[in-house]
Amino acid sequence: MLALIQRVTRASVAVDAQVVGQIGPGLLALIGIEPGDTAPQLRRLAERLLGYRVFSDEAGKMNRSLADTGGGLLLVSQFTLAADTKAGMRPSFSTAAPPEEAERAFNQLVAICREKHSGGVETGRFGAHMVVDLVNDGPVTFLLRP
């Protein structure tokens, strides 16, 4: 399991030209689910998403987390993150979880984040073709694993 997180001033995701999730300042997290990802890993990733310090404090240092700022969290499932890109000129998706397993894990991650974060948790639509619009603040982008 991995999450590509971006600190944003705003982000939204649309399906069929209709916005299905949007946030103001906060984090956009693209989530890749791999076969065999476990409930403890989901909980750990949720902790990292909410607790990872990527927001500036009064001194300008990255010392504040999403939990500290109360910013929004936009979670978007993206199976291509889990692709094997080591060889050849075409990605292999054999390292991504099957759709049913991935959807179940993604929904569990969303539920955990919603339970723990009062700042608002929005999502895309699992399995849909989505258009993600964002303004990356910094830019600040990190790849997290549980």
Swiss-Prot record:
Family the UniProt entry places it in: Belongs to the DTD family.
GO molecular function: D-tyrosyl-tRNA(Tyr) deacylase activity; Gly-tRNA(Ala) deacylase activity; Ser(Gly)-tRNA(Ala) hydrolase activity; tRNA binding
Catalyzed chemical reaction(s): glycyl-tRNA(Ala) + H2O = tRNA(Ala) + glycine + H(+); a D-aminoacyl-tRNA + H2O = a tRNA + a D-alpha-amino acid + H(+)
UniProt xrefs under CDD domains: Dtyr_deacylase
Entries under InterPro entries matching the protein: Daa-tRNA_deacyls_DTD, DTD-like_sf
SUPFAM superfamilies associated with the record: DTD-like
Domains as described in the record: A Gly-cisPro motif from one monomer fits into the active site of the other monomer to allow specific chiral rejection of L-amino acids.
SUBUNIT field: Homodimer.
Organism, as annotated: Xanthomonas campestris pv. campestris (strain ATCC 33913 / DSM 3586 / NCPPB 528 / LMG 568 / P 25)
Protein name: D-aminoacyl-tRNA deacylase
Name of one Pfam family that matches: Tyr_Deacylase
Motif (Gly-cisPro motif, important for rejection of L-amino acids): 138-139
Function: An aminoacyl-tRNA editing enzyme that deacylates mischarged D-aminoacyl-tRNAs. Also deacylates mischarged glycyl-tRNA(Ala), protecting cells against glycine mischarging by AlaRS. Acts via tRNA-based rather than protein-based catalysis; rejects L-amino acids rather than detecting D-amino acids in the active site. By recycling D-aminoacyl-tRNA to D-amino acids and free tRNA molecules, this enzyme counteracts the toxicity associated with the formation of D-aminoacyl-tRNA entities in vivo and helps enforce protein L-homochirality.
Positions of disulphide bridges: none
GO cellular component: cytoplasm
Name of the gene this protein is made from: dtd
One GO BP: tRNA metabolic process
Location(s), subcellular: Cytoplasm
First-listed, main subcellular location of the protein, grouped into a coarse class: cytoplasm
Keywords for the protein's UniProt record, in alphabetical order: Cytoplasm, Hydrolase, RNA-binding, tRNA-binding
The EC number(s) this enzyme carries: 3.1.1.96
Superkingdom assignment: Bacteria
EC class (word): hydrolase
